[in-house]
């Protein structure tokens, strides 16, 4: 018996009857659970009156009693908790049979006394923030039985660590065991094979290792087994699992399995689901899998399987999902696949399949997803793919398909994505494809399509229309303006002629416009000004005439403008110098004239932007302007050019000096004044703690002084505080007032304060008043990854350490994206926001803060979505961020780890680390990943182990794909960093189908 429980029992008066003891335990439980301040009134557990007498406690919300007024069940599902813990007194409820405290974000540990409850049958602690080790049996003399009556235990999605609890044959009633989504380590105990009644085993999403025990094959009643995801086993699937005759679902995906797929699995006649994807399985698909007559879902994707799809799979008449993508399969797609009457999902992309797509595919009427991209398929696209009017995703890109696009696809109203790029398709595009009500992407680039665009266009949800590199001609119809959701319009390298229709101005969400390489004529329409979201415009290689419209200078977020190789005349609008967002300009090879402005954005453009315009002069152009054109202040050409260069230098020097002076003086004066005011208003401070803290708000305020500053950034100023023996980092948010009176801020920060993860910097609480918010974090003594990597100690951070830091940071981000409810997008992932503790373990910092900054920005932070050099390219033209934006930023961090270089600077004008790596590797005679990573690797380190470096490079390049949909999720990133063979380079848009 745990000593705590023994002490509790000794302290209770002998006269305390059992129901009264239950009331005492309930009072302790209520006192230990702190409701969220944002909870609705009345607060949770308000009816739990500690002064109640029996049997009033039986009416408490969530409490159930038996006929003797003994508590037999407690159900507190989704209780909105701010903090708290499970008290040891809960073990006094000796009649308790069902304890459910789920989805409450409950922190703390599982009390050691909990396993001693003699009647406990159902224990559900899932979806909380419980941490520490799970209690193990007391080894002392007279130990109480360990969960003697347990039938169900669900601790899914917590932060539990250590070894798995030692359940064994003594737990003869245990039917349901779910410990997934934690951080348990070590091997699966062999004793789990002695749980004779077990029907459900969930150990997925931990960090387990060792071999999968053969003893699990003795679980003859087992119906569902989930033991994959993040676990890293040695060896493969035990062939003995073929003896699990009752098994319905087997999920061993993403857990480093090797070896063949055991043919013995074919004996599992009741099996409904077999998931073995994202492993390193090799060999051929065993024909015995064709004996799985009940199978509905088969996923063997992302392995090293070879050979052909076995003919025996024709027996899988109940198959709904067949995923075999990213293997090394060859041969043709068997015709019997078209005969699967229940088939909804067929994904075979990225193999070496040849031949035609089965002609009858889709006739079954249930097909929803078809992805056969990146194979060597030939022949026509079958006409019946959407026969059942259910097809949603059609991806056939990067094959050798030929013939016309079937007209039937234009009538497929359920399609959301059509990707047929990089084939040899001919003929006109079916008019219906431009009017699909659900489609968000139509991609037909790099084919041999001809004809003209229809006069009727109206797909309300089409966000990307990609028709480049074909032979489509005629005019661009005015109806192109009837696509309200359109963000990217790509019509380059076709045969379009006539004017760019003014209706283009109706596209309010348009962010990228590319009509280059056509035969368009007329003026650049003024209506482009109505496309306020435009970030990239390419009108090059056409026959546009007239002047560059002054109205285009009103596009506030335009980053790229290319009007080269046209017939434009007149002068450059001087207002273009005020387009602060414009980073790339090309007006070359036109007939422009007059002076190039010598101010604003024009200071960053070089001569190549203006070449081929004999009438241009001044600025970076070699020809100097005559004195009259230069406004009477000219002189010799060399003098004018010298003046322009000097002006650039002067602007830079003045700006740099001013920034340093303001920062220095402001920091001294501002910090001093702020602290003085803080002292005067010390009573106005309020501290909200997310765990027990031994210091006060005033203690925190006293630490906020200039001598304690350890960092400054876009989110605020960071101070190192030491008070009452506690060491913490204090972040003073800039540009935001409101303090305790901002309920929205308080609620949001409270949400962040509930987050508990090993690789996330813990938010301890916050201190606020009317003007200021101070966030309190655990202190990380080794600073940031950026400081370490780019400072004098960067050379001491070896490849193994860099890979470990990458994996740890990825786990933290993965938790924010996939395991938080609601999910959290970081918005400012960078090496300076990855902090290192005393053991150099990585912790993600500043998560979720970007939304609190309002208009506050700094020289290194954009207004909304992150720091320069880390911002995903799509943000420039969508102004939206999502999880894939974080993935891109994380890819930049990986490139920093690989190269040892900062994300910007030292690469040339307008070049960041991503474009530099692409440029360097593209110029190599050897296009292997090994050659690529060696070409850009940090020269401070010895280039070994190469395999580890290559894996980091592969993952990095997948993360920084241009198209956000092509990037992996952070869950996939964690997997790839943990499983080197699964990191596929250049996967590009293939990942869009996940």
UniProtKB/Swiss-Prot annotation:
Q: Name its GO BP terms in alphabetical order.
A: cell differentiation; regulation of floral meristem growth; specification of floral organ number
Ordered alphabetically, the record's keywords are: ATP-binding, Developmental protein, Differentiation, Glycoprotein, Kinase, Leucine-rich repeat, Membrane, Nucleotide-binding, Receptor, Repeat, Serine/threonine-protein kinase, Signal, Transferase, Transmembrane, Transmembrane helix
The entry's localization annotation reads: Membrane
- State whether keyword Nucleotide-binding applies: yes
Membrane topology value: Single-pass membrane protein
Domain (Protein kinase) spans: 704-978
Q: Which InterPro entries match?
A: Kinase-like_dom_sf, Leu-rich_rpt, Leu-rich_rpt_typical-subtyp, LRR_dom_sf, LRR_N_plant-typ, Plant_LRR-RLKs, Prot_kinase_dom, Ser-Thr/Tyr_kinase_cat_dom
Which segments cross the bilayer?
Answer: 647-667
The effect of disrupting this gene, in the record's words, is: Semi-dwarf with altered numbers of floral organs and rachis branches. Reduced number of tillers.
Swiss-Prot/TrEMBL LRR repeat ranges: 73-93, 94-117, 118-141, 147-171, 172-194, 195-219, 244-268, 269-292, 293-316, 318-340, 341-364, 365-388, 390-412, 413-436, 438-459, 460-483, 484-507, 509-531, 533-555, 556-579, 581-604
The entry's active site is 828 (proton acceptor)
Q: Name one GO molecular function term.
A: receptor serine/threonine kinase binding
> Which Gene3D superfamilies is this protein grouped with?
Phosphorylase Kinase, domain 1 (3.30.200.20), Ribonuclease Inhibitor (3.80.10.10), Transferase(Phosphotransferase) domain 1 (1.10.510.10)
Which EC number(s) does UniProt give?
Answer: 2.7.11.1
Q: Which residues form the signal peptide?
A: 1-17
Question: Which residues are noted in the entry as ATP-binding?
Answer: 710-718, 731
Return the similarity comment.
Answer: Belongs to the protein kinase superfamily. Ser/Thr protein kinase family.
Its annotated function is as follows: Receptor-like kinase protein that regulates the size of the floral meristem.
- What name is this protein filed under? Leucine-rich repeat receptor-like kinase protein FLORAL ORGAN NUMBER1
- The organism encoding this protein is Oryza sativa subsp. japonica (Rice)
């Amino acid at each position: 018996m745990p000593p705590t429980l023994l002490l509790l029992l000794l302290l209770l008066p002998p006269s305390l009857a059992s129901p009264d003891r239950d009331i005492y335990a309930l009072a302790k439980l209520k006192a230990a659970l702190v409701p969220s301040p944002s909870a609705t009134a009345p607060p949770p557990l308000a009816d739990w009156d500690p002064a109640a007498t029996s049997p009033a406690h039986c009416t408490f919300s969530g409490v159930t009693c038996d006929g003797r007024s003994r508590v037999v069940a407690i159900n507190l599902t989704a209780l909105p908790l701010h903090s708290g813990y499970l008290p040891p007194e809960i073990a006094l409820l000796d009649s308790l049979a069902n304890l459910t405290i789920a989805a409450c974000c409950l922190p703390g540990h599982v009390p050691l006394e909990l396993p001693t409850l003699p009647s406990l049958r159902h224990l559900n602690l899932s979806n909380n923030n419980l941490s520490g080790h799970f209690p193990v049996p007391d080894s002392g003399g007279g130990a109480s039985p360990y969960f003697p009556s347990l039938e169900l235990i669900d601790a899914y999605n917590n932060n539990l660590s250590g070894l798995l609890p030692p359940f064994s044959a003594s737990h003869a009633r245990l039917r349901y065991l779910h410990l997934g989504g934690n951080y348990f380590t070590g091997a699966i105990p062999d004793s789990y094979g002695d749980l004779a009644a077990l029907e459900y085993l969930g150990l997925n999403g931990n960090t387990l290792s060792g071999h999968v025990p053969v003893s699990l094959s003795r679980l003859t009643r087992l119906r569902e087994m989930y033991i994959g995801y993040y676990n890293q086993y040695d060896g493969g699937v035990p062939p003995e699992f073929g003896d699990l005759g009752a098994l319905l679902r087997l999920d061993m995906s993403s857990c480093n399995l090797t070896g063949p797929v055991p043919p013995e699995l074919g004996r599992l006649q009741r099996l409904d689901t077999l998931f073995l994807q994202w492993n390193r399985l090799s060999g051929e698909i065993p024909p015995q899998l064709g004996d799985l007559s009940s199978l509905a879902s088969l996923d063997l994707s992302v392995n090293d399987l070879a050979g052909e799809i076995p003919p025996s799979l024709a027996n899988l008449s109940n198959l709904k999902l067949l995923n075999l993508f990213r293997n090394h399969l060859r041969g043709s797609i068997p015709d019997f696949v078209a005969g699967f009457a229940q088939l909804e999902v067929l994904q075979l992309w990225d193999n070496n399949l040849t031949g035609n797509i089965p002609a009858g595919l889709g006739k079954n009427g249930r097909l929803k997803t078809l992805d056969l991209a990146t194979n060597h398929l030939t022949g026509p696209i079958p006409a019946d793919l959407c026969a059942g009017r259910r097809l949603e995703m059609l991806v056939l890109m990067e094959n050798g398909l030929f013939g016309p696009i079937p007209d039937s696809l234009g009538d497929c109203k359920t399609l959301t994505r059509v990707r047929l790029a990089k084939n040899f398709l001919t003929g006109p595009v079916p008019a219906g494809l431009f009017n699909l009500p659900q489609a968000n992407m139509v991609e037909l680039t790099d084919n041999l399509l001809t004809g003209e665009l229809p006069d009727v266009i109206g797909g309300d949800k089409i966000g990307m229309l990609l028709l480049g590199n074909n032979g489509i001609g005629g005019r661009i119809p005015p109806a192109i303006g009837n696509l309200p959701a359109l963000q990217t319009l790509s019509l380059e390298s076709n045969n379009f002629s006539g004017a760019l229709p003014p209706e283009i101005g109706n596209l309010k969400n348009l962010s990228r416009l590319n009509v280059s390489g056509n035969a368009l004529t007329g003026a650049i329409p003024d209506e482009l000004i109505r496309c306020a979201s435009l970030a990239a415009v390419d009108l090059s290689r056409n026959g546009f005439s007239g002047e560059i419209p002054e109205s285009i200078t009103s596009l506030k977020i335009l980053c790229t403008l290319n009007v080269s190789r046209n017939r434009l005349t007149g002068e450059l609008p001087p207002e273009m110098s005020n387009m602060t967002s414009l980073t790339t300009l090309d007006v070359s090879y036109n007939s422009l004239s007059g002076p190039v402005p010598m101010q604003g954005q024009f200071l960053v453009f070089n001569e190549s932007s203006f070449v081929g315009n004999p009438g241009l002069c001044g600025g970076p152009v070699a020809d100097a302007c005559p004195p009259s054109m230069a406004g009477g202040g000219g002189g010799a050409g060399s003098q004018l050019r010298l003046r322009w260069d000097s002006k650039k230098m002067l602007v830079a020097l003045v700006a740099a000096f001013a920034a340093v002076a303001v920062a220095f003086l402001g920091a001294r004066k501002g910090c001093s004044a702020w602290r003085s005011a803080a002292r005067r208003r010390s009573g106005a401070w309020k501290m909200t703690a997310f765990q027990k803290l031994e210091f006060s708000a005033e203690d925190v305020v006293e630490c906020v002084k200039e001598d304690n500053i350890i960092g400054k950034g876009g989110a605020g100023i960071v101070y190192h505080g030491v008070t009452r023996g506690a060491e913490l980092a204090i972040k003073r948010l800039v540009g935001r007032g409101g303090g305790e009176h901002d309920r929205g801020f308080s609620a949001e920060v409270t949400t962040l304060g509930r987050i508990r993860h090993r690789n996330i910097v813990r938010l301890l609480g916050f201190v606020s008043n009317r003007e200021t918010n101070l966030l309190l974090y655990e202190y990380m003594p080794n600073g940031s990854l950026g400081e370490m990597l780019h400072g004098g100690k960067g050379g001491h951070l070896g490849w193994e350490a860099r890979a470990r830091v990458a994996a740890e940071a990825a786990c933290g981000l993965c938790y924010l994206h996939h395991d938080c409810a609601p999910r959290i997008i970081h918005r400012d992932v960078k090496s300076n926001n990855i902090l290192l503790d005393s053991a150099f373990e990585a912790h993600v910092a500043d998560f979720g803060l970007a939304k609190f900054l309002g208009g506050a920005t700094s020289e290194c932070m954009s207004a909304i979505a992150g720091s320069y050099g880390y911002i995903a390219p799509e943000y420039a033209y969508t102004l939206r961020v999502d999880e894939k934006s974080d993935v891109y930023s994380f890819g930049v961090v990986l490139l920093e780890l690989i190269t040892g270089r900062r994300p910007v600077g030292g690469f040339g004008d307008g070049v960041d680390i991503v474009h530099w790596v692409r440029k360097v590797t593209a110029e190599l005679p050897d296009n292997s990943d090994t050659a690529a990573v060696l070409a850009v690797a940090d020269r401070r380190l010895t280039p070994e182990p190469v395999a580890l470096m290559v894996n980091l490079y592969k993952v990095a390049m997948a993360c920084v794909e241009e198209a956000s949909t092509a990037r992996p999720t952070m869950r996939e990133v964690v997997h790839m960093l943990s499983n080197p063979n699964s990191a596929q380079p250049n996967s590009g848009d293939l990942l869009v189908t996940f």
